[in-house]
Structure formats: structure tokens, C-alpha cells
Amino acid sequence: MHIAVLGAGSWGTTLAVLLARKGHAVKLWAHRPEFARTLQAERENTRYLKGTLFPDSLEVVGDLDGCIAEAEMIVTAVPSQALRETARAFSSLPFQGKIIVNVAKGIEVGSGMRMTEVLMDELPGLQPGRVAALYGPSHAEEVAREQPTTVVASSPSMETAEAVQEVFHTSRFRVYVNTDIVGVEVAGSVKNIIAIAAGISDGIGFGDNAKAAIITRGMAEISRLALKLGGDPMTISGLSGIGDLVVTCLSRHSRNRFVGEELGRGRSLDDIITHMNMIAEGVLSSKAVYALSSSLGVEMPITQAVYEMLFEAKPVEQAILDLMTREPKPERD
């Protein structure tokens, strides 16, 4: 199959390599033409995925039109807040009939839209049954080294979800399917915010009790928002929910946990972001999800605390005190 992967960061590069290793003809699009030329010449992404060599069937290009033209499937792997701009750039190209698989995790600032909603908004000819999300506990560094990984392909159309499953599934990259794309996308987006909170706990020096509480109560927040938006709370117990939440809150590879840890140690957000090589999606997602939850009347205190620490300069100690001194209540409320 001819596949276009849009976005040459660590995850886009990893998936392009995985697909090429499986025998697909893959074009990896890089936003900056000079970066595309460097990757094509060096046959390795030393900036984002050092040590993973490109298979012969992987071509890196800077021409979006040429990348899309032959593709039967398009994988969008650009940062979540850049997805609208990218989709708009190929909205006039012949994408009809192609399956579009989004792998970026986030909620758009301003609109409060999930990533597949952004795609539908910018691509009027895109049918809901031709779009999918591929989410789950899947750090690029481990997938690139072919360490066992499981994810879920979700689409309103089971036929599309199964088509994505067939394209991506390998003996080291197991793909499940479901049709609850709302639950999958909400879980994959909010977990990054909860991971920032988990990182803050690490940075301050709190123990396992605090981390367990953040993960568990974070799951409750994800479930409440997913249910309000029409998702199935049971999805949160799956790979895109608890699976991705645990790995993002605990892993040394997690950018979002790293941001939180550095905040907990006293560094400013601006300083952390300036010196990071990659994007931590949870930072801007906290702004989008807090606004969305507030407008819907969904209580998400951990999300609110992260937002206030990141964007309202609320002291970490005060945010923790506010969380711990909230009115006592039943666990399932």
C-alpha cells in the first residue's frame, strides 16, 4: 500500500519506519523542505529518533502535494495544534476515498475540538467513516526498537478500524479495534495533562501514594469528560485510557511527565519549553480541556490545577493545598 505520513517528528518517523519495514511504500513529509532533504540524505532522523535507520521503501519529501497524490492512506502525525493548518494545506488535494489516520493527541485550543473533528472541519469531503485514530501506550523510542507494543485503532466505521489494524499490525505492534472514537481521543488527550501533574509530584519529591492518587483520580476526570461528550466510559479502562495514562505518568520517555517534574523542581515553564527538543502536548491541551470542561460543567480539578499552574502562575504548593482541601465527597462523584 502507498502511505503518506505527515510529520517527521519522533512519532511520525517511527510509524513511517514501522510501515516501511512491513513492506508498504511510505512517503514521510517534513514541514521544512531542508529538513526533508537532510533526512532523505542521511537515512536517519538524528534530531528526533537517533539510531533508527530508514528502510529503502521509505522516502522523505518536502512536497505535500506529491506526498498525498499517490497515497491510499494518510497518517497525520503533526503536533495537535498544527493539525488544522496541515489539513487546510491539503484540503484542495484529491484525498477523497483515502483513509485518514490521526495519531496526534490533543484538544484544539479555541475550538475545543478533538483531532478527528478538526480534520472533518477542514476537509468537508471527508466522510466520518473514513477517519480513524491510532492511540495507546506507545512511546516512539520503544516502537522504533521493535519492543512489544499494543494500541487501538478507532473509527466510527468498524470496517475502517479493521483496515487500519491490518495495515499497522505486526508481531511486535499489536493493534486492537473499537468504534468509540470519542472516548479514545478524549483519553489520549487528557492523559497528557494528568502526566504533567504526576511529574510535578515527582519533582516535589512526593511518593507512590500521591502518584497513584493522581493516576486514579485522573482516570475519573477522563471518564467524566468522555461520557459528557458521548463516549463510552468503558473505553477508559482500555489501551487508550488506563494503558496510555500509566505509561505517560510513569515513563522516563514521557515529555509531559518531564515538564511536570521540572516545574515541581522550580523551573519556569518558559525555560523548560525553550530547552526542550520536542513538544509536550499536555501544556496547550490543559488550556483547551480546562476551557472545554468549564463550558460543559464537567468537574476536572486536576486538569484545572495544571492549567492554573501553567497559565495563571499559581504556585505549586497552593495548587496542591487547594486539591487536598477540597470538600470531602463520595469516591464515585
From Swiss-Prot:
Residues reported to bind NADPH: S10, W11, H31, R32, K105, A140, R255, I279, E281
Localization annotation: Cytoplasm
CC terms in the record's Gene Ontology section: cytosol
The keyword Nucleotide-binding belongs to this UniProt entry's keyword annotation: yes
Pathway assigned in UniProt: Membrane lipid metabolism; glycerophospholipid metabolism
Primary enzyme class: oxidoreductase
Binding site for sn-glycerol 3-phosphate: K105, G136, S138, K191, D244, S254, R255, N256
Protein name (Swiss-Prot/TrEMBL): Glycerol-3-phosphate dehydrogenase [NAD(P)+]
Organism from which the protein derives: Chlorobium luteolum (strain DSM 273 / BCRC 81028 / 2530)
